[in-house]
């Protein structure tokens, strides 16, 4: 067993400079999957080279896609839609929940056996939300108790197209069903009552899938996919990941006399919940150099130290910022007044019980907070006096690790996390980037 690697963050001042955040994790996974399915070559610029994404690349290679890195781009020669090969060994996704769930959807309708395994954290996460629609399509499944990994899919001779209303706001469920529809004759329909990140829909259209999206008067989206399309390789430029940008954003807002610019960040409207919330808290964040890259809105973010105030974050906003709540909780600890985060029960089934881990980390660093089944209330104060000094258990969760290192840059006393290794699952450059801006982490 590998040894844990603790690391400590110390009170810092005057963060400054420019950084370019690594490519968006959601788009990186989808680029590899669709590139691996398409005919011809797909060229990817700005791929996030994190452990999670590379595990998805390995899975696509195991099923017949040719993937190589050449200079600063990745080149994929796909198998052609409907032509994946059966993997000879179980597909190991490590910590990658997104990769595992999307690939389950993609391979489910193939008439072959595919086994999925992962690390201890991923093996605790529920997969039923993906497996239930696959069962309706005719996929037979052998899973560990509670629909968890390890699990094996046995695809049908001919999958059934389904019309499926998503019971929870989940881009992963929506995307898995649409990817399953690619190798299913007929029309697959996903009904989405609450908008979630829409990268899959945009990218499917770009690769040549026949996709129709209608929205009713209540805002419910009906996404219709005609099965078995011809997919053609594309050139993709991946913008910076807003979920990773959250950490330097919060650091610059909280560390006194800071002024940083984060270049080339994705500002898709379905991913803007954190920035909208921070603006409500009086954060000084400017969107500069706004433009489009590959159909996505992108901007540079200029962030300056700000005196934040507590706010109530409505539950309706949760899908657009579900991965950013750990960073927001740190901001809330140093904001004047009470911050209430509602409708965040989805955090309980992330890489850890993220809601519980957040509350534990805040309390051990002397922040007054209340944890409920689906909410977190943080009683913040603009003074850092008396805060920090804790040793945080990260529970193998990269976002808990990064959040409390940011906390330590602001608090009076240093903050230590029990292990930094899992940060590599989403943001391998995190520590050197923060150090480059002037943050004290060692």
Curated annotation (Swiss-Prot):
Instruction: Give the pathway.
Output: Metabolic intermediate biosynthesis; chorismate biosynthesis; chorismate from D-erythrose 4-phosphate and phosphoenolpyruvate: step 6/7
Q: Give GO terms: molecular function aspect only.
A: 3-phosphoshikimate 1-carboxyvinyltransferase activity
Q: Its catalytic activity? A: 3-phosphoshikimate + phosphoenolpyruvate = 5-O-(1-carboxyvinyl)-3-phosphoshikimate + phosphate
Keyword annotations: Amino-acid biosynthesis, Aromatic amino acid biosynthesis, Cytoplasm, Transferase
Q: Name one GO biological process term.
A: chorismate biosynthetic process
Q: Which Gene3D superfamilies match?
A: Enolpyruvate transferase domain (3.65.10.10)
Name under which the protein is recorded: 3-phosphoshikimate 1-carboxyvinyltransferase
Instruction: Identify the species of origin.
Output: Bartonella quintana (strain Toulouse)
